[in-house]
Every structure is written in C-alpha cells, then in structure tokens.
Amino acid sequence: MTFTAALLTLAASAAAEKPRLDMVAFFTGHTRTESVLKVALHKPVPLIVDSVGGKGDKGDFVMIDTVHEGNKPVRTRKWIMRPVGPNHIRGTLTDATSPVDVVVSGDSATITYVMQGGLKVEQHLQLQPDGRTLSNHVVAKKFGLKFARVDGTVRKLD
C-alpha cells in the first residue's frame, strides 16, 4: 500500500467514526442554549436557557434550567433523569405532564414528553464535530398540528 493510499484509508476511517453523544457527560456542569421560539400566529422570540446539571442525591441526574423566553418573567424548571437501559433514559421535567423519554443513537438524541394542555414535544439533539455543541430542534404539536418550534444550539461551557 502506498503512503497516499494509507492516508486516504485512515481519513475515510476517521470520517466514518461519528462522535458518540453521552447525555450525562455533556449536561454535567454548565450549558447554555440559545434558540428562537416560533409559536403559531406569533412573532419569533429569543429563548435562552442556562443550565446546571449533575448527580443527584439518589444517584439520578438532576439539571436545573433558568429559562429566559422573550419578555416573559424568568422561570426555572427541573429535570430528574435515570438510565433505564442501554442508550435509554427516563425521568421527569417540571414542565411535563408525562414521563420524559430520551433515546440516544450514536451522535444524536430524541427527547419526547407531553406538556400541559396536551402539547406533544419532540426534541432532537445532534452532537456537532467540536464535541461541545449540540444542534437543538424542538417541535410541539397539538391535535397532530405543529403549534410551536424551537431551533438553536446548546453549548457546553465547562
């Protein structure tokens, strides 16, 4: 094998290996989510979420979000999550009326839950090549119709 062929093989192998998303490792410590919230029939508003996550006293993962949504008063919400199988996490969120379900697949995760008023939320997170940023896309539906959408990024700060 020539040197050039070896380099091309190595480059192809490295490109084929996607980074794996470890939700607990990513969200342990401080993260900041910067997004735009688009609700049907309303103007888009900035949605900024500052989060602190870590191990809870019962061995679970706990994350506290400070949510800045447009001109609304700042609010907090709390996630409590536990692994329930390989690449599968389940728990609670103060905004949710159903359990929160997280399925991780390679470099991405899908989070689903139901909010007050019957809004069904589906969130997709995709790890970016830098390993410290996630793309964040959320759709909230009611009666099968898209009611709201969030698009932005999550950055690991420490």
Task: Describe the predicted segments one by one.
Residues 125-133, 137-158:
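Edge beta-strand at a domain terminus
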Residues 34-116, 120-126:
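Central antiparallel beta-sheet cores of small beta-barrel/beta-sandwich binding domains
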Residues 27-35, 135-136:
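A short, Trp-centered hydrophobic/proline-enriched beta-strand micro-motif
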Residues 21, 30, 37-40, 55, ...:
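Extended interaction-bearing regions that mediate binding to partners or small molecules
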